[in-house]
Every structure is written in C-alpha cells, then in structure tokens.
Amino acid sequence: MELLAASRACIFFGLVTVLDAWGVQQVELSEGAWAMIDGRDVLTPTNTTTRVTKAWTFLETPPGCAGDISVKKVCVSHSLCEDNIIIGKHCNLLTGEHGIALAEFNVVNGSLRRTDDVYFVNGTVFPILAETRSVLQIHRATPSIAGVYTLHVSIDGMMKHSVVLLTVKKPPKQPQPQPRLRVKTPPPVTVPQVPVKTHTDFVVHGYHSRVYRDGESFELSVNLESHIVEPSFSAEIQWYYMNTSSSSCDLFRVFETCIFHPTAMACLHPEQHTCSFTSPIRATKILHRVYGNCSDHGNSWPSRCHSTLLGNRLYFIQPAQNRVDLLFKDTPASATGLYVFVLLYNGHPEAWTYTLLSTANHFMNVLTDVTRPRLGEHFYTDLGHKIITPHPSVATTEELGAWTRHYLAFLLVIICTCAALLVALVVWGCILYIRSNRKPYEVLNPFETVYTSVPSNDPSDEVLVFERLASDSDDSFDSDSDEELEYPPPPKPAPQLPPYQFVDGGDAPSGRSGFKVWFRDTPEASPVPLHKPTLQGPDYSRVASKLKSILK
C-alpha cells in the first residue's frame, strides 16, 4: 500500500493499494448478515509453474473511519488507471496488517496440490484457500470485522493481489406506520412490539490460535456477550489448560460433546488421548471463578456480581479487569498449550471456546469435532489413578504405571501356563517310552541263573527236554486210568573230570560248546546223602513233564 499525501492544500490523504489484474471489491454487509466473498483468483498453472503460495491478510478499520474510506480510480499515467482505496485525513490509521491464512501448493500434472496450510480464524470470519478458488466466509457480521482483506498470490515469485473492502452497517430501522386520521372516531394508537427473548443466551467470539514469542505479554480475550432473563442465577467461569508442546500429532481435536458430558467413559479414556481435548477433568484447571447469587442482566455481570476466585493460577497469568479474559505477562515458552474457556450457567455448560497459544516451533492445527470420541482399547480402570495434564510452569510429566502392572500380571500367567504344559509333556513322554519298551508277557525272575552242570552240546549228554503232552483224554492229568507208569532205567552218571583240569574251547574236540570253565583249586567233597538212593527208585520225570506243561 502507498500513502498519498497532497503537497498542495487538499482535504484528504489516502492509503493506496497497488494491484494487479484483479482489482478492488467493495462489499457492504448489514450487521448479523452471512456472506461468501470470492477472492477472484482464477489460476491456470503453466508448464513451468512449480510452486504457488496464497495468503489472506486483514487491515482493521479504526473506529469512526468507516465513512472516510472509499474506492476511487487513480491514474498513474494517461493509459494506466487502477482502483485504489482512499482513506480520509480524519482517520487515524495506526493498526497493522495481520495474516489470517497461509497455504502452499505444488504443481502436479498441471494441477495444484496442497502441501501446507495454516488458518487464524475466529467465530465470524473464515478464510478459505483452495486449489481452484479462495473465498472469505462471513458468519453473523459484526462491526469489528470491517476493514481491508487482501488476497496475495505468489506464482514462482511473481505476486498478484486481490483486495476486498468490507464495511458493516447497522440494519435500517423500519418506518413506523402513521395512524390514519378519521373524523368520527379517534385514530388507533399502535405500539411497536419489541421481540422479547424468553431464554438466556451466551455468545463468545475469539481467535482459536495465537503464536507468541518467549517473554511476550498479551491479552487472551473471548469477547463474552450475555443475555440473561432470569432474575437471579449462579454461574462459574473456568479456564483449563492442556500441554501440547510434547505432542507429535498432525491434527489436534477438541471434542465439543465432552464439554457437556465430561464424565462419559469415552471422554475420560479416549483413543489417542495425547492428540485430543475431551473431558475437562483430564486437563489442568488454572482459573475458577464462582458466582453464587447474581441479579445483574447486562454484559458486565462478571465484574459487577460478587465472586470467589479459586484455582492454582500461574505466575505469568493474571485475570483481566472484566474477570473473564486472561492477561499474560512475560510468557515463557513452557506456556505452550491449549487454553479452554467454559461458562457454566446454573450448573450447566452454556458457552465455551478455545485458543491455542504456542511458539512458532510448536504450532499445530486444531479442529473442533462435534462427534463422540472413540473409547481407547486399553484404558485405566483403577479409580485412584488420575490422568492430569502437567502444570505448564513445571517441565515434568506424571508417569502412568497401571498398564505396567496389568501387563506384568498377564506375562506371569502366560509363563506359568507354558511351564505347566512343558512338565505335562515330559511326563507323558516318559510314560510312552516306558510302555514302548515293556514286554507284556515277560515273567520277572528275582533269582540269578544257576548252572547245575557244564553246558555242552555233546549228543551223548542227556538233555532234559520239556515237551507239551498231547492233548489226549487218556493222557490227561486228571485221567482216572489205572495204567501203571513205566519207569525208564536211570541215566548213567556222566564222567567226571579230574580236579585242576582246564577246559579250553580251542583244544576241545569237535561237538563241544567251547565254554571256558574254571574250577576251584581244592575241590569240595560232595556231601554224603542221608539216604542212599536205590537203584530201582521210582521215576517221576513223566509227572514232572506233565506239571511243567500245565504250568507253562
């Protein structure tokens, strides 16, 4: 913008904006109106275009200067004339131009693609920077939004501008109908009826973000407007704080539903609790003002009614004179976070707003979400454990240990179960191994093997052969036949070797077993039997054979 000062006697001085092809728009709105203002930035990227940057800026019109601002055509030469904004000399323009939106785009396949954007909005003006169009959306216009809105577009370093001069005027009053005069009857008197509100209404207007420097002082205002119909009421003004300096979220959400239902389970234990503001119970209360019995119905009731100040206020935060806003003095970098204002009327939340205060390094996007947050998969069930945002002046975090105890108990149960299964598998394997090596028909003999004679395979040696008797009824053990048993002659005694004789398998004649046998040096004399067996004694070999065959 250029400031024009007349060297001769002139009646005005002007603020001139040098524009490119898009010119100046003059928009006039009535107070409370809604509007959509086009920025007229029709862009056609060329083949050489690589980067496009768009920005909205705002220059506020000082109070009392609305009538001294106009749009006129200023000619630099005979062939170059452009529209410019002229401000009269009676208007003291001391305000600065502020950025309210910024977006960066890249050109991909001949079209724009958004890469980064940031918006500084309040509840009335919503700047929009899109790939094809840029607009200003006005909700319920107020005199405070009047001023000059400039759209800056940079295409590979070449700047273009589009200016909107916005003025807000009060709606014209409706003319009162004149009563008709009649000769015979007196004219009726009509009294205009003023609509009376039957309910209490609170409105807040404030910016949702502010970037500050370390050590800066400023005021955080919510612009509270009140309309109260009850003769007496109670109210509470609460300020909450949530630290966002350590958050790595691309988008921070503020759930409006949880402001009105702070004790809901999904609000107390939300999903991604570090990236959202849900229940005020999870935040730190930095200011709490209670009004017990107030009967003032104007907008100044917070400062006129008696109140009690509670809460642990920070050393760099002071309550403003109107007892609603906050004054920040020598603000440190640790004060970065989300500050939420809540107004309770007769115990119920009626109005709320938020502002993100941050340094340039910790700035993030904040979005208001009117849905219910999702419940976290693992939320804290012990009522003694509270989730509280740490104090902004103390750079400490509160460790949450409930989940550690739960996971350790779960891990211990798994280890015990695995150990029990392992022991059971080992026992079962041993049982299978014993069963596989066991002989089902083996007869266990507790006695050692005893040889009664020297083993030999000489056919001349008699060998006791156990034969199973034929299954004949005549030969049965229980047979009643009187047949006499035939007793064969007794066997001849085997020749005895002389003492100290060594039998070697190598010198043994053919047909021998080949066993090596050692005898004692002094052979023991065989005991003399008590009864000398008779030569013709009975032979029980057949009976023994039958018994053995039966026992076998």
Swiss-Prot record:
Membrane-spanning ranges: 411-427
Q: How is it placed in the membrane, per its record?
A: Single-pass type I membrane protein; Single-pass membrane protein
Which keywords fit this entry according to its UniProt record? Disulfide bond, Glycoprotein, Host cell junction, Host cell membrane, Host endosome, Host Golgi apparatus, Host membrane, Membrane, Signal, Transmembrane, Transmembrane helix, Viral envelope protein, Virion
- Give the primary localization class: virion
Q: What InterPro entries does the record tag this protein with?
A: Herpes_glycopE_Fc (IPR003404), Ig-like_dom_sf (IPR036179), Ig-like_fold (IPR013783)
Segments on the Intravirion face? 428-552
Give the Virion surface membrane side ranges. 24-410
Keyword Transport assigned to the entry: answer is: no
- List glycan-bearing residues: 47, 109, 122, 243, 293
Under Pfam families, the record lists: Herpes_gE
User: Which intervals carry biased composition (Acidic residues)?
Assistant: 473-486
Q: Which domain of life is it from?
A: Viruses
- UniProt region (Acidic), positions on chain: 470-478
Q: Where is this region: Interaction with gI?
A: 65-91
Q: Where is this motif: Internalization motif?
A: 451-454
Protein's cellular compartments: Virion membrane; Host cell membrane; Host cell junction; Host Golgi apparatus membrane
**Signal peptide start and end residues:** 1-23
Modification note? Phosphorylated on serines within the acidic cluster. Phosphorylation determines whether endocytosed viral gE traffics to the trans-Golgi network or recycles to the cell membrane.
Q: Which Gene3D superfamilies match?
A: Immunoglobulins (2.60.40.10)
Extract the ranges annotated as region (Disordered). Answer: 473-515
- Disulphide-bridged cysteine pairs: 249-275, 258-267, 294-305
Q: How does it assemble?
A: Interacts with gI.
What this chain does, per the entry, is described as: In epithelial cells, the heterodimer gE/gI is required for the cell-to-cell spread of the virus, by sorting nascent virions to cell junctions. Once the virus reaches the cell junctions, virus particles can spread to adjacent cells extremely rapidly through interactions with cellular receptors that accumulate at these junctions. Implicated in basolateral spread in polarized cells. In neuronal cells, gE/gI is essential for the anterograde spread of the infection throughout the host nervous system.
Q: Which family does it belong to?
A: Belongs to the alphaherpesvirinae glycoprotein E family.
Q: What is this protein called?
A: Envelope glycoprotein E
